[in-house]
Amino acid sequence: MTDVALIDAGGANLGSVRYALERLGVDARVVRDAAGLHGAQRVILPGVGAAPEAMSRLRTQGLVEPLRALQVPLIGICLGMQLLFEHSEEGDVECLGLLPGIVRHMTPALGIRVPHMGWNQLVPMRESALLAGLPERASAYFVHGYAAPVTADTVAACDHGGLFTAVVQNGLRCGAQFHPERSADTGARILRNFLEMSFP
């Protein structure tokens, strides 16, 4: 069985992500320091809340540099995905820098509420095994007020007052802006794909 490390970055969704993994038959172990990453074959970085506090917690745990140097597949979920990018406007904080781009505050407009909350459709941008088995017009559940830009690494986007990255992959680094643990079959499929797919 795959050894899955689930990083405790202080996000309230840690337990629900762990439960979602249990439903897939995966008993992930919670990691709170660099030593906990040893032997992991997959690493999951969930998170909700604010980027500055999450980065501060990762620094306190001594996890920033080990995550930057990680040589196994990593997926960030919700705030965890945003932390993979270079910088966040939220608190003007430097993030892990594993993916190019700056996470910016979403702009409210007529009919566009921020935070973006609820179900929204994924817009495939390029092929990736992360999306294998998903139906056309698959939807996922989002809760966020900041968003990463669409880049060459974007696998799927979402439109809420403009396109933003919903699923991302660059080599071993992956991310999902939505909550897989709250996204029914879509979320379960993407988690399973991450756990089972072959990486370059």
Curated annotation (Swiss-Prot):
Location in or out of the cell: Cytoplasm
Catalytic reaction annotation: 5-[(5-phospho-1-deoxy-D-ribulos-1-ylimino)methylamino]-1-(5-phospho-beta-D-ribosyl)imidazole-4-carboxamide + L-glutamine = D-erythro-1-(imidazol-4-yl)glycerol 3-phosphate + 5-amino-1-(5-phospho-beta-D-ribosyl)imidazole-4-carboxamide + L-glutamate + H(+); L-glutamine + H2O = L-glutamate + NH4(+)
InterPro entries (alphabetical): Class_I_gatase-like, GATASE, Imidazole-glycPsynth_HisH
Active site residues per record: 78, 179, 181
Any one of the GO CC terms: cytoplasm
Glutamine amidotransferase type-1 domain: residues covered: 3-200
Matching PROSITE patterns: GATASE_TYPE_1 (PS51273)
CDD domains named in the record: GATase1_IGP_Synthase
Recorded metabolic or biological pathway in which this protein acts: Amino-acid biosynthesis; L-histidine biosynthesis; L-histidine from 5-phospho-alpha-D-ribose 1-diphosphate: step 5/9
One Gene Ontology term from the biological process aspect of the record: L-histidine biosynthetic process
Location, primary (coarse class): cytoplasm
Gene3D superfamilies linked: 3.40.50.880
Record keywords, A-Z: Amino-acid biosynthesis, Cytoplasm, Glutamine amidotransferase, Histidine biosynthesis, Hydrolase, Lyase
GO function term, MF aspect, one: lyase activity
Complex formation: Heterodimer of HisH and HisF.
NCBIfam families per record: IMP_synth_hisH
Function description: IGPS catalyzes the conversion of PRFAR and glutamine to IGP, AICAR and glutamate. The HisH subunit catalyzes the hydrolysis of glutamine to glutamate and ammonia as part of the synthesis of IGP and AICAR. The resulting ammonia molecule is channeled to the active site of HisF.
Official protein name in the record: Imidazole glycerol phosphate synthase subunit HisH
Organism from which the protein derives: Xanthomonas euvesicatoria pv. vesicatoria (strain 85-10) (Xanthomonas campestris pv. vesicatoria)
